[in-house]
Amino acid sequence: MAEQGLTKKPATAKNHIFAIGGGKGGTGKSLIAASIGICLAARGSEVLLIDADLGTANLHTFFGLEPPKIGLSDFVTKKKSTIGGVVVKTGINNLKLISGAKDMIGIANLSYGQKARVLNNIKRLKYKYILIDLGPGTSFNILDFFLISHCGILITSPEPTSIENTYRFVKSLLFRYLRKTINQKLVKSLIDRGVRQTSGQKFDSIFDLLEAIEQIEPNLGYTIASYLSTLDIKLVINEVRTDRDRAIGEKMALVARKYFGIRIDFLGSVSHDANIRKGLLQMKPLMAYFPHSKAFKEIDEISQKITPAYQLDLDFSFD
């Protein structure tokens, strides 16, 4: 009965999907997603960027592009029958884009059926690397986009509010992960109460939740803990200015281990660069002002750390 109440499916992905998120807006997720995409494409890999910051998409601006005439909403509304039909060029060899800039009002609130169709089709895309740039917040849509990835990359800045929002994102992600993985109704109900923190049910750490689950289903808590260990989550600290800022990454990784019982690998930090904002205001392509900066070199180093062939044991499906 070691795996009672859990669903497990073998992964069949032939691509490597990376989701880039973090909970708070303004931390530089889009910049880092675009830059990693450029680095991977420069090494000869076929790369696709997906702007899933639904409702406030801006990834096209990092390539000096006007809002593309086709975008993700055309696939969502079935104006385009295939997701490949909304892919556009970025002007960089080997690097393509699915833009969200044309998205209609309400796109941020995808129905379950719409989300399932998008996620399942993303998994079938034949690119070596797929980078999904997520919007801020902890909605189910954002969490589910993060969970289909082989590797999730959290982007935060040294500010306390950004760090706090990252922890909140991780906690929400784990509860969502368990909610979608566990079939046992009583355990699902327990998780739901913990998320809402109703009826006096509050879990300060994932270990409190696992202990409560053990009371309902002996041994299931241990099994869930082993499944949590399969999550591949990374962390990048953006906009760093001091050595103290750079030290935050390792500290956050330790906190994640202590309170969430998961391993988060600190990939590195990215230096503050005032020229980035200047370039964006002038609608200049990222490559025109960024490739020789210290920040870009740091992102290039990060891109080299995430390129091994990741393969999840758990594969979420949205049928």
Per-region residue spans from a language model:
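Conserved catalytic-core segment of NTP-binding enzymes
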Residues: 135-265
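P-loop/Walker-type NTP enzyme "switch/lid" segment
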Residues: 52-128, 197-204, 214-217, 226-229, ...
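Nucleotide-binding motor/catalytic cores of P-loop/tubulin-like NTPases across gene-expression machines
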Residues: 260, 271-282
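C-terminal boundary of histidine-terminating zinc-finger modules
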Residues: 281-295
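Conserved lysine of the Walker
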Residues: 29
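Extreme N-terminal, non-catalytic leader segments
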Residues: 1-26, 35, 39-46, 81-85
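Hydrophobic positions on the alpha1 helix immediately C-terminal to the Walker A/P-loop
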Residues: 32
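Conserved nucleotide-binding/hydrolysis micro-motifs of P-loop NTPases
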Residues: 54-56, 102-105, 137-138, 159-162, ...
